[in-house]
């Protein structure tokens, strides 16, 4: 089994300056059309090659917002047994029922075989968490979701630059 670094944050003076500049400005949101948040959204959208990007205050807020787009009330959402507590909180905030499943010990990410075992009539959505810069087996997870008509929402808060099959 390989060793996985969970905490290796590199922050230099450039990041500290950008954070300080943003904190001292009056533009903490992108709605104004100016400022570092808008610049971040544009750069991040390009970096992950997506059509849109909305910066929020935390990973919890991002999950809460994303899950609010689906009617998960009284429905099960499959998530990994190892994640920050906010993953389950976001499900509960939206009325869903967290269904914890085991992980692949080599990646600390959801194990597709365990997902398959956990799917039942109440399952509505699968929420894989890409952890420590490692990607879940998205090919298998996407197939499971498609075959079972389940929604897929990915949590990449701990792996924003991670690639799966060459794609971020």
Q: Can you annotate each of these PLM segments?
A:
Residues 44, 156-157:
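Active-site His/Glu-centered metal-binding helix of metallohydrolases
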Residues 8-11, 28-32, 100, 107, ...:
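Pocket-edge positions in alpha/beta enzyme catalytic cores
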Residues 1-29:
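N-terminal "arm"/small-domain region of PLP-dependent enzymes with the aminotransferase-like
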Residues 68-156, 163:
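PLP-dependent aminotransferase-like
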Residues 30-76, 90-94, 100-102, 167:
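Phosphate-binding glycine-rich loop
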Residues 27, 32, 158-166:
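Active-site region of PLP-dependent enzymes
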Residues 14, 35, 39, 61, ...:
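Short alpha-helical
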């Amino acid at each position: 089994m390989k060793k996985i670094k969970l905490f290796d944050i590199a922050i230099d003076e450039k990041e500290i300056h950008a954070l300080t500049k943003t904190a001292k400005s009056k533009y903490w949101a992108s709605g104004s059309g100016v400022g570092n948040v808008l610049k971040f959204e544009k750069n991040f959208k390009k970096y992950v090659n997506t059509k849109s990007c909305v910066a929020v205050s935390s990973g919890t807020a991002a999950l809460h917002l994303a899950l609010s787009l689906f009617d998960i009330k009284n429905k099960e959402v499959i998530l990994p047994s190892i994640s920050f507590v906010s993953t389950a909180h976001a499900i509960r905030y939206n009325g869903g029922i967290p269904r914890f499943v085991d992980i692949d010990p080599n990646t600390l990410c959801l194990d597709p075989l365990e997902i398959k075992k956990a799917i039942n009539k109440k399952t509505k959505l699968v929420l894989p968490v890409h952890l420590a810069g490692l990607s879940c087996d998205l090919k298998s997870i996407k197939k499971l979701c498609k075959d079972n008509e389940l929604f897929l929402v990915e949590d990449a808060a701990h792996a924003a630059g991670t690639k799966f099959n060459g794609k971020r």
